[in-house]
Amino acid sequence: MISQPTLQKLSNFEDKSLLIVDDDNPFRQRLARAMEKKGFTVTQAESVKVGIETVKSQSPAFAVVDLRLNDGNGLEVVKEIQKVNLKSRII
């Protein structure tokens, strides 16, 4: 039997940094506002290039990454996140 992951409250996490990488500006901004209201400290990136630069300087605890970006594949950002912070939770 496969065990289900336990949901944790955001208050249980010391680092509440969230990186949102998406080239759809209105969507990214709406999501950022919603997540800030939930208690996250949000950083936004509109491209693979900016996403990778942000990851190198900030190492987010959480990330929401669009895989289809104008300048490349969002998996490049995901790989960079995994290099700098194996504990990051990525969607």
Q: What feature does the model see in each segment?
A:
Residues 44, 69-72:
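Residue-level signal for the "D+5" position in two-component response regulator receiver
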Residues 66:
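Active-site residues of response regulator receiver
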Residues 25-43:
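Two-component/phosphorelay signaling modules centered on CheY-like receiver
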Residues 53, 75-87:
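Short amphipathic alpha-helix used as the core "switch/output" element in two-component signaling
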Residues 1-19:
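Non-catalytic signal-transmission and effector/linker regions of two-component phosphorelay proteins
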Residues 44-62:
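Acidic, metal-coordinating helix/loop segments flanking the phosphotransfer/catalytic sites
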